[in-house]
Amino acid sequence: MRLRTIPVLLLVLAASNGLRAQSPDEQFRRANQLYQQGKFAEARDAYGAILAGGYESPDLFYNLGNACYKSGSIPGAILNYERARRLLPGDDDLRHNLQVANMMITDRIEPTPRLFVWDYWDAIKNFLSLSGLTLVAYLFYALVAVAIAVFFLARTYALRKVALLAGSGFLLIFFFLLTVLIARLGDATRTDEAVVMSPIVTVKNSPDPKSSDAFVLHAGVKVQLVDRVGIWSKVRLADGKVGWLEGSSVEVI
C-alpha cells in the first residue's frame, strides 16, 4: 500500500483542465482511505477512475493491484502489478506481490531457459528508477562538458592529459547510461505484452473460430502479442507455445 500522493508520470489531459490539477491527489487519498477501511472493491473503482482520467504512476498501479487482489480480481492484480513493474522494476514489495498473485492462477508456465548474460543486463537496467537513471546520465554529461572545458582552458600538458583521459572515461560511461536509459524507456512503453482477463480461453491454431484447438489458458496468464488479424491476436507464452485468441480476452499491459 503506497499512501503518498500521486507522482504523476503521464498526463493526457488538455491544457484547459489545468484548474483541476489537484483533483487526482484528492481522489488518490480518498481511494487510500477506502482501502484502509477494508472497502476494497470501492477502492479498486476509485483508483480505476483516476486511471480513466489519464493519470498514471507506479504507486497508482501498485495500489490498484493491491485493491484488485483484496477484492478477488487476481487477473486485475497481475495486470496492474505488471504495469507498475515497468516503472519500478527493482521494487522488492512489488516483486513479492506479483509472485504471490501469480501463485493464485491456474496455469503454471515455465519460461524457456535463456543466457545468463540477459539476467545481468536486466539487473543493470533495473538497478535505478527511470528518474534516477536520467539524473545520473545528466551528471556524467555535465562531467564530460567540464572535462572538455578544462582540456581547452588548461595551460599545462599534464592537466590537459588528465582532462582528456577523464573526459574519455566520462563519455564512455555516459553512452553506456544512455543505452541503458533507452532500453528502460523501451521496456516502459512496450505494447506487445498482455494479461488474459477472461476466465477460460481456448487458443486456436489459426485466426478462425473453426480452427483446431491449440491449448487452453486461464485468467491471469501473461502473454506476448506477436501478430493481429481482425479480432484475433497471435500470442506466445513464456514456454514458447504459440496460438491465436480473440483480442477481447486479453488486456495490454
Language model region names:
Residues P113-L153:
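Membrane-embedded alpha-helical segments of integral membrane proteins
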